[in-house]
Amino acid sequence: RVSLQDNDQKALERAPALIEGALTTLTKGDAIAADEATAAQGKITTVASVPDAVEDAALVVEAVTENRDIKRAVFANIDASAPPDAIIASNTSHLDVFPLMPAGRQARCLITHWYTPAYIVDLVDLAPGPETTRDVMTMMHALYAGMGKYPIAFETFISGYVANRIQAAMNLEIFRMLDEGLASPE
């Protein structure tokens, strides 16, 4: 079961149609069967509040804008409502969110950075915090691998992860080639 929450009511109202569109794309591409798409859609519900979303959750994934104050507030709300044994994951693309996460839950906190569109791109970065247990990392790696994803587990937090760092290296090389006159922008 997946509970989806967003403070933007219009975004929350649009979510089921967007999910249905993604599942239709996967069905048309023969990535999943139509009955699997229907079953998946039936497991997703939208809810109005963070407490409603996380009250029975085994895994909570935070995916709000890259703003420390907003993330801190969301983590506090999750901490107040999620079961004590829930794993808390952040989908941050570059922030070190571990100082923002609940102090008493650090052993069960990690970063699970999905690439977009997540229903097509199979890569997921996993980064532990200073106190994240090996068991949590192993469990999350197995969960994502079981979904058909390719999790890349880091030993520690780094800013930028795999694809971002490869893209940065490619950009540097392209600009070097342009500067040296080895290639034209056209």
Regions found by a protein language model. Give the residues of each.
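NAD(P)+-binding Rossmann beta1-loop-alpha1 motif at the extreme N-terminus of oxidoreductases
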Residues: 1-25, 29, 81
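Conserved SAM-binding loop
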Residues: 4, 46, 90
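A structured beta-alpha segment of the ubiquitous adenosine-cofactor-binding alpha/beta core
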Residues: 25-81
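Rossmann-like NAD(P)(H) cofactor-binding subdomain of soluble oxidoreductases
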Residues: 59, 64-124
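Internal alpha-helical scaffold of NAD(P)-dependent oxidoreductase catalytic cores
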Residues: 126-157, 168-186
